[in-house]
Curated annotation (Swiss-Prot):
GO terms for cellular component: cytosolic small ribosomal subunit. It comes from the Bacteria. It comes from Leptothrix cholodnii (strain ATCC 51168 / LMG 8142 / SP-6). Belongs to the bacterial ribosomal protein bS18 family. This is Small ribosomal subunit protein bS18. PANTHER family: 30S RIBOSOMAL PROTEIN S18 (PTHR13479), SMALL RIBOSOMAL SUBUNIT PROTEIN BS18M (PTHR13479:SF40). Pfam families: Ribosomal_S18. The keyword Transmembrane helix does not apply. Binds as a heterodimer with protein bS6 to the central domain of the 16S rRNA, where it helps stabilize the platform of the 30S subunit. InterPro entries: Ribosomal_bS18 (IPR001648), Ribosomal_bS18_CS (IPR018275), Ribosomal_bS18_sf (IPR036870). Part of the 30S ribosomal subunit. Forms a tight heterodimer with protein bS6. The gene is rpsR. GO terms for molecular function: small ribosomal subunit rRNA binding; structural constituent of ribosome. The keyword Ribonucleoprotein applies. HAMAP family: Ribosomal_bS18.
Amino acid sequence: MPPPRGKFSKDRKTKRNQQSLLFKRKRFCRFTVTGVKEIDYKDLDVLRDFVGENGKITPARLTGTRAFFQRQLTTAIKRARFLALLPYSDQHKV
């Protein structure tokens, strides 16, 4: 009988463990460290750091932002988009 392929293969688990060991780093909330109370939609330099190249909001699991600040961040980005301070997609140039 040939070895299992696809999602039941054992090679996938070992490969995933090797990758996670290479890129493991401690994530921290930028807003907690700097002592920010509220995230402002007019602070475009900060907001651009949390928007990807394609215009999507970067998730908290990648940035390490706490849930409290992630909610504020998404509303601030959406407000900035509505006021045309930030683009909705990567097709628009700033």
